[in-house]
């Protein structure tokens, strides 16, 4: 099943995997949140679980603040900070509904959370304490940090662009260019735009600069669709992760496939083998050498028998991730 460039992590979560995130400066450590109410820290090269801590409900997202501190939130409405060296935890604060997204913004040194309570909250990680609550038009489904910009995707196909240095007003209000519900948004490492995916096998490449000549460059494409018995099956695109160096990106869908795309030449660079079940989350390491792939059933067909959830660690090459020079 797995080749020499890929292996499966031992001691995976016991229920669905919600998020995988690499440590900011090394591909050695991977943080994993799960519906089994745990957050796990893995030593990837050693293929061992270093540490595990619990919430009182499913954990929907997690993020590193720095190499020794993990933040996480989920269905128990609680935002936790966990010291990965001392195994001490701190309840930082709460939302009024489940916390869907947890991200760190290094340029402004704030943690950002997005919730189904229709707010985004900023947190000062040094104290740690709440540094502001900002209303969103609908439930927050996904968010991504781009320099000092924050891109928020909500229910109702809305996209909001905020300036994390001045949250007094929304910089841009947009509507998704895709017809169906937004599943994931990730910002380009070059800070020029973002990629948005929907539940209907489509991805949009968008640019932040509102000028007409830049907006002309935006486009969308179909993906994660399979012909079965001459019928096209269309799958949600659940996960996006950017390669920090090349500005190419990987997508993962409920079809069990991972694709890597070159947004500049509008080409697919590669497709990996089919994984046992839906791709729930993806993360490139900071140096772009490693991709963590969460293969985890997302209950698209309700509670049927399904393959066990797993995290695959894949070494990726420049041939798979670098734009082809024209």
UniProtKB/Swiss-Prot annotation:
Entry's Gene Ontology BP terms: cell division; chromosome segregation; meiotic cell cycle; mitotic spindle assembly checkpoint signaling; regulation of chromosome segregation
Carrying N6-acetyllysine, the residues are: 179
PROSITE patterns, alphabetized: WD_REPEATS_2, WD_REPEATS_REGION
Q: Where is this cross-link: Glycyl lysine isopeptide (Lys-Gly) (interchain with G-Cter in ubiquitin)?
A: 216
- Please report the PTM annotation for this entry: Poly-ADP-ribosylated by PARP1.
Cysteines paired by S-S bonds: none
Its source organism is Bos taurus (Bovine)
The protein, known as = Mitotic checkpoint protein BUB3
What this protein is reported to do is described as: Has a dual function in spindle-assembly checkpoint signaling and in promoting the establishment of correct kinetochore-microtubule (K-MT) attachments. Promotes the formation of stable end-on bipolar attachments. Necessary for kinetochore localization of BUB1. Regulates chromosome segregation during oocyte meiosis. The BUB1/BUB3 complex plays a role in the inhibition of anaphase-promoting complex or cyclosome (APC/C) when spindle-assembly checkpoint is activated and inhibits the ubiquitin ligase activity of APC/C by phosphorylating its activator CDC20.
Answer whether the UniProt record assigns the keyword Lyase to this protein: no
UniProt gene name: BUB3
Q: Which family does it belong to?
A: Belongs to the WD repeat BUB3 family.
What Pfam families does the annotation carry?
WD40
Name the InterPro entries on file. G-protein_beta_WD-40_rep, WD40/YVTN_repeat-like_dom_sf, WD40_repeat_dom_sf, WD40_rpt
Sorted alphabetically, the keyword list is: Acetylation, ADP-ribosylation, Cell cycle, Cell division, Centromere, Chromosome, Chromosome partition, Isopeptide bond, Kinetochore, Meiosis, Mitosis, Nucleus, Phosphoprotein, Repeat, Ubl conjugation, WD repeat
Q: Which GO terms describe its molecular function?
A: ubiquitin binding
**Which windows of the sequence hold WD repeats?**
5-43, 46-83, 86-124, 128-163, 223-262
Phosphoserine PTM positions read: 211
The entry's cellular-component GO terms read: bub1-bub3 complex; kinetochore; mitotic checkpoint complex; nucleoplasm
* Subunit comment: Interacts with BUB1 and BUBR1. The BUB1/BUB3 complex interacts with MAD1L1. Interacts with ZNF207/BuGZ; leading to promote stability and kinetochore loading of BUB3.
- Cellular compartment(s): Nucleus; Chromosome, Centromere, Kinetochore
Residue ranges the record marks as coiled coil? none
